[in-house]
Design a protein with these regions (language model features):
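FIC/Doc superfamily catalytic core
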Residues: 1-362
Length: 362
């Protein structure tokens, strides 16, 4: 699976999208992740409702399912900032993420879990039978187990995708919190991928693939082991069951991201060109053929035998649509240059302008 994921990663790295399109894709991906990750935990909201809740203005009171999806979205934004700062995996990061996931919940649900009242067993119960599905480690073992996980993440030579799978498994299994363990595990597993260059530009939702078959997700993470942590889950005999499942989901997700970004790239160029009139397209074509560096409206107007004002007006449209950028000197535009977007997509833009011309001349 890793070879195929690497191939998809390489394909995605060659795709260049405008800032506007990339931001839109990232936001939609975060919404999908917020929907899917909470769906795994039994959140009843539909994808449409999740979208509406995230887009709605901040208000004082939310229903619990609404608060949960907003919290997940906020946590994704928070981790995006941390990736940009290259922040290491740490206990503080784990606690901060869980605090965001449980924002609005009662105090005892935030932070590491403590002792239970005498005679009460802390366990994850089957909602239908009432029997314990999973009995996590004792609360007093949690700090040491987290320290071991953090040391592993920051010192191992394992492939980053294996590390992400281990973080996911261990945070669900150590179950350090009263609530929010699964969501925190999925967020921080994604963070490890992002931090190591496997975030696929923040596009697509890995959580979506876990949510497609929730039973398979839980069966893979449980690996057929007894309910008690100390009866095998602390050191699973066949970790490859979970690792293979995790990598298969990443492979499917990375393939979808490839398709999504390649399709978006074509739409992005065509969309930007659709705002240009014939003369503006001709000017863009001329600039791409004749200028590698800076140029001024006056020199372009002389070469094209049109007025300076006409060129300035056409350049304003090219600037607005991201093809050209103005160079300011003392807050005044002195010259222009082709944008990075234009240079990255020069061949495709030329082809699209050319095919558009041929169609209109029939």
């Amino acid at each position: 699976y890793i070879i195929e994921i690497e191939q998809n990663r390489y394909k995605v790295s060659s795709v260049k999208l405008s800032k506007t399109v990339m931001n839109k894709l990232r936001k939609n991906s975060k919404k999908k992740s917020s929907y899917a990750s909470n769906k795994i935990e039994g959140n009843p909201l539909s994808e449409k409702q999740v979208n509406e809740v995230i887009e709605s203005d901040e208000r004082k009171h939310y229903l619990k399912p609404e608060q949960e999806v907003r919290n997940y979205f906020l946590a994704l934004n928070y981790l995006e900032e941390k990736v940009n700062k290259k922040e290491k995996f740490s206990k503080k990061l784990i606690l901060d993420v869980q605090k965001l996931v449980e924002k609005g919940a009662s105090k005892e649900k935030i932070g590491l879990r403590g002792p239970m009242p005498p005679g009460v067993l802390f366990a994850v119960y089957d909602s239908k039978t009432g029997n314990p599905d999973y009995i996590p480690p004792e609360y007093c073992d949690i700090p040491g187990l987290l320290d071991e996980l953090i040391e592993y993440v920051n010192t191992t030579d394992d492939h980053p995708l294996i590390v992400a799978a281990v973080v996911h498994y261990q945070l669900v299994t150590i179950h350090p919190f009263e609530d929010g363990n699964g969501r925190t595990a999925r967020l921080l597993s994604g963070y490890i991928m992002d931090l190591n260059g496997y975030g696929f530009n923040g596009v697509g939702s890995l959580e979506e693939y876990f949510a497609y078959d929730i039973d398979e997700y839980y069966e893979s993470i449980q690996m057929g082991l007894p309910a008690l942590y100390y009866s095998g889950r602390e050191n699973p005999p066949h970790p490859e069951i979970w690792i293979h499942y995790f990598l298969r989901m990443v492979k499917l997700y990375s393939g979808k991201v490839c398709d999504l970004q390649l399709a978006s790239e074509e739409e992005d160029i065509a969309g930007s060109l659709s705002f240009l009139k014939g003369k503006e397209k001709e000017l863009l074509q001329f600039l791409m053929k004749n200028y590698r560096g800076e140029f001024t409206p006056i020199e372009v107007s002389r070469e094209l035998s049109v007025t300076n004002k006409t060129i300035i007006n056409r350049l304003a449209v090219l600037v607005k649509n991201g093809f050209v950028i103005p160079i300011l000197v003392k807050e005044r535009i002195r010259s222009y240059e082709l944008s990075e977007f234009t240079r990255d997509h020069e061949t495709e833009i030329m082809k699209m302008i050319g095919s558009g011309k041929r169609r209109s001349s029939k």
